[in-house]
Amino acid sequence: MADAAAPDAASVRNFTINFGPQHPAAHGVLRLVLELDGEVVERVDPHIGLLHRGTEKLIEQKTYLQAIPYFDRLDYVAPMNQEHAFCLAVEKLLGIAVPRRAQLIRVLYAEIGRILSHLLNVTTQAMDVGALTPPLWGFEEREKLMMFYERASGSRMHAAYFRVGGVHQDLPPKLVDDIDAWCDAFPAVVNDLDRLLSDNRIFKQRNVDIGVVTLDQAWSWGFSGVMVRGSGAAWDLRKSQPYECYAELDFEVPIGKNGDCYDRYHIRMEEMRQSVRIMKQCIAKLRAPHGQGPVVVDDHKIFPPRRGEMKRSMEALIHHFKLYTEGFHVPAGEVYVAVEAPKGEFGVYLVSDGSNKPYKCKIRAPGFAHLQAMDFLSRGHLLADVSAILGSLDIVFGEVDR
């Protein structure tokens, strides 16, 4: 009788559940369909597109200046890094050189964006596995950094501060002093986080040997950024293909050797320290005599004249009117420019037909390539490990769905 009641092995089906799209550990509007054999993950099927807005198509209907704010809304955790890629692409087509002071300001704010992103990721990754203190410490520092964003651009998140040919306006000396003071105090916060998490028994159990990816697998999946460096490759576009003034800055590229969640956490922690190092060098150069000067290219066919000049000169008024109605024309051609964004290689493939609007702007989002490997990374792990793996990928849906 007992044998008759026992289920036949062939009739036992795997259990399918939904993870998200309103899940607190989903890091946005992610829906994962998980196929489970007990607690073990057999298959992960990511469903994306819930935040799709047609960004690439919208950019085709805007002038080059109007397109910049769309890039803030991709990886909205570190907005200026995306603007950077687009501006570099347009500048390459125009064949213009950015003034040195503008380059230093761009690099300074790109590194602020990197710290903003890594702080959010490291602390929420800790929260995903049960540590509730780090997010409180991390958000306190992020608040200060977003104030620096606001003081430079007027906006905490969607800055639209970078311009083709430079940046919108110069930084006041008091702001540079405050950023310098913050750089002196911040390493102590990273050390506190390090002490709290790095040797914590529970944190290590949840991250060591979880979501392991070898270097060959990382390359074949199209990984970049921390995902590749965690597997042992010192591939950082700031070093391998330097842009702006990165070639003259002194910093290290941290790499891991195991390719697991724990290594990726350590790399992000060390990258925050290196970013502070870069910021200190930028501030020193901004204060030096050779760091003074204009913050935008001196060409009124690309960047509008000052308001005071516009009220005195008819030519300046015409330039201003033409730039804000028609915009500037970019020579026909195509270009691919990539920057080392906090999430990985953020690329812009820009095609111009010689008009005042992009013919095509293809965006290469690093998170998109990382998310496609979610099934590969999660198979054979327990259900509880899915949120740890997802946290270590550092996914933001603005750039994945665009």
Curated annotation (Swiss-Prot):
What GO MF annotations does this protein's record show? NAD binding; NADH:ubiquinone reductase (non-electrogenic) activity; quinone binding
User: Can you say what this protein is called?
Assistant: NADH-quinone oxidoreductase subunit D
Instruction: Tell me if Transmembrane helix is a UniProt keyword of this record.
Output: no
PROSITE patterns recorded for this chain? COMPLEX1_49K
Assembly information from the UniProt record: NDH-1 is composed of 14 different subunits. Subunits NuoB, C, D, E, F, and G constitute the peripheral sector of the complex.
Compartment(s): Cell inner membrane
Q: Which SUPFAM superfamilies match?
A: HydB/Nqo4-like
Q: How does it sit in the membrane?
A: Peripheral membrane protein
Pfam families cross-referenced by the UniProt entry: Complex1_49kDa
Question: What is the protein's known function?
Answer: NDH-1 shuttles electrons from NADH, via FMN and iron-sulfur (Fe-S) centers, to quinones in the respiratory chain. The immediate electron acceptor for the enzyme in this species is believed to be ubiquinone. Couples the redox reaction to proton translocation (for every two electrons transferred, four hydrogen ions are translocated across the cytoplasmic membrane), and thus conserves the redox energy in a proton gradient.
What are the alphabetically sorted keywords of the record? Cell inner membrane, Cell membrane, Membrane, NAD, Quinone, Translocase, Transport, Ubiquinone
List residues traversing the bilayer: none
Q: Which reaction does it catalyse?
A: a quinone + NADH + 5 H(+)(in) = a quinol + NAD(+) + 4 H(+)(out)
What InterPro entries has UniProt attached to this entry?
NADH_Q_OxRdtase_suD (IPR001135), NADH_UbQ_OxRdtase_49kDa_CS (IPR014029), NDH1_su_D/H (IPR022885), NiFe-Hase_large (IPR029014)
Q: What class of enzyme is it?
A: translocase
**Highest taxon above the source species:** Bacteria
Q: What family does the Swiss-Prot or TrEMBL record give for this protein? A: Belongs to the complex I 49 kDa subunit family.
> Where is it found, in Gene Ontology cellular component terms?
plasma membrane
| UniProt xrefs under Gene3D superfamilies | Cytochrome-c3 Hydrogenase, chain B
What's its EC?
Answer: 7.1.1.-
Q: What is its main location?
A: membrane
Q: Carries keyword Cell membrane?
A: yes
